[in-house]
C-alpha cells in the first residue's frame, strides 16, 4: 500500500507540477484584476447603460463596463 502511495505522489509531481511550470499561461486567472484592467467594475447587476462582459470571482457577480 505504501508503494502505491509513493507511486501516486511521484506520478502527480512529474505530470502536474512540471506542466504548470512549463505552461504558466494555463494557470489560475484573477478575473477581478482582469475586470479592473479593462476599466470595469464587479457588480451583482449591471445598470442599463453598462455592458456585462464576463463573470468576476463569484458566479453571481458580473464585470460591467
Curated annotation (Swiss-Prot):
GO terms for molecular function: CCR6 chemokine receptor binding; chemoattractant activity. It comes from the Eukaryota. GO terms for biological process: cell chemotaxis; defense response to bacterium; innate immune response. Disulfide bonds join 35-63, 42-56, 46-64. GO terms for cellular component: extracellular space. InterPro entries: Beta_defensin_dom. It holds the Pfam family Defensin_beta_2. Belongs to the beta-defensin family. This is Beta-defensin 17. It comes from Rattus norvegicus.
